[in-house]
Structures are given as structure tokens and as C-alpha cells.
Amino acid sequence: MKKQEQKNKTVFHAVAALLAVLAVVLVLYGGGRWLEKRAEKPETRTQLPQADQETVEVDGVTYRKKSRLTAILVMGVDHDTQDSYEYRKAGQADFLRLVVLDDADKTVQQLQIDRDTMTPVTVLGLLGDRYEPVTQQICLGYAFGDGRQTSCEVTVEAVENLLGGQTIDQYLAMGLDGISTLNDLAGGVTVTLEDDFSAIDPAMTKGTTLTLQGEQAETYVRSRCSVGVGTNEARMARQESYIKQLSVQLDEKLQKDQNFAVDAYDALQPYLTTSMAKGQLVNEAWAAKDYTRLDTIKPDGTYQVGEDGFMEFYPDADALQQAVLQLFYEKVE
């Protein structure tokens, strides 16, 4: 019981970091493509440290599992919030970021997970029956669930598969219809447009400096094909700079007013699905402002177009192994 209370406290201490990380769920990719079953592809990953390994040796260096961690999966989903969803139409988890909280070192570190990462994903039947995992884009697992808890759990399982079975303790997902609310909670974010968005919003011309309000934020972070070079890589770079500024503004508001956590949660709640309780989050929010945020881990990898015409991302084996070690292990001196 004491161990569980300590783990819960770790989660709730970091709500301020989570409010900032909520910014990343703006990385939403319009799609609605058919979720066809993907053929199995051979895996090329280096052997990852498994969750039940307390120590592991890599390249002659011994690593020990960190003991005071909490891992939270944050998801951005390409659906509008509603009470229920048809089978396979719950939306895709187009943004995935794992937030790992270290209560011993008082740090927060994030792992950026590409939506097109190929990994075993559990498939659910129409009545909820579970079938053998199929190697497919990790974003697709969400669609097989109910658009809420089941979808989140399937996605959590897929990320755990990707990371060699490392445990994810909590999850938080937000629908795209919460974008405007989140942006405006921060008071709007000022950006200088390096691409032209005027085909979508006449006020958003290249070179203009403006404070994004409401739907402008959605346009800025979601647009891809009709903007600039049209690549997902370019869009991710644009989103990352936006997220950093939004995070700063959310932090400033929480520093000044502890009740901001309450207001933010209440405003965003209609768009959220989470395993974390509001009351506990709000009560412990104030302590989170002192957590140090480490650089986001972004594993290298290879993109290719699959047989079905959709993009696939295969993370570099060594990069993924190093990410797991950095997040969940520490060197034994």
C-alpha cells in the first residue's frame, strides 16, 4: 500500500509538467483512413531490456532499473469528443509521447513516438474479442477500442510492446476538439510564420508575426500537405517550437496561481480520457513546478512507404535501446 501511495504521489506531483505536455496533443494529423490489417514484417530491433530485468549489461556497462519512476502515455486523438464511436472509427492516436517522471531525481523526461512506428498492436473484434497482435502503425490501435478507456489501454499495450515490456502506469488522451481551449488557456501563443497558411486562414501569411487564437492554433499545428514542403518532418519541427512556447506560458500561469490547475482541468475535461483522478491531481499540482525537464528523446529511424501506400517508420535498433536505458535505467557505479 505504501509503495502504491508513493507512486500515486509521483504522478500527482508532476501535473504541471503534464499540463505543459498537453500541448503536444495538438500534433494531430487529419486522416480517417481505412484500418486494414497489415501483414507481419520482420522486426530488426536490438534486444531491448525487458521490464522484469532489474539489471542489464550493454556494451560492457551494467545498468540498474530505476525504482521511483512513473510513466505516463499522453495521446492526441484525431476525433471529436462524443459519447460513443462506431467500430474502427474511434480515431487514431496521431500523437504519442511517453512522459517518465523520476521522483528520486525530481526530473521529467519525454520520449517522442512517431505515429507511423511499426510495432505489434493488439486487434479487437467487433464484440471486443482480442486477436493476436499485428505489426502495424502504432497509431492504429486506438481505433479498435471504444474511443475512451479501451482504446487507451490498447495503445498503452502497443507502446509497452515497442519498449520491450516496460510498464506504463497512467495514460491521458485528448481529442482534437480541445485544441482551441488549450491554446486559449495559455493566452494564445505568438509565432512568426515561416510557411504560408493563407489558403486556410487569410490572416496567416508567410512572415507574419501574430498571436494564435482558437482555431488558428489548430491550423498552425495540424496543417501539412498544403503548407511548405508538405512533409510530416517539417510539421513536427513547427509543432515542437510551438509546444515549447506553450509550455512556458502554461508554467507561468501555474507558478502565479495554483488554481490554474483546477481551471485548466475543468476546461479540458470534456475532451480528456485519463486514468488519473482530478482531485488528487489538483491537490498536488503546486509541487510540480520544481521538477526539472530533461531534453526530449527522439529516436532516429527509417521511413518507407508500405505495400498499402501508407508511411511506415522503423526506429533504429540501437537508438531505441538507448532510449529505454535512458528512461528506465541508471548506470551501476
Question: Which role fits each region the language model picked out?
Answer:
Residues 2, 8-19, 25-333:
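Non-catalytic, solvent-exposed segments at the cell envelope interface
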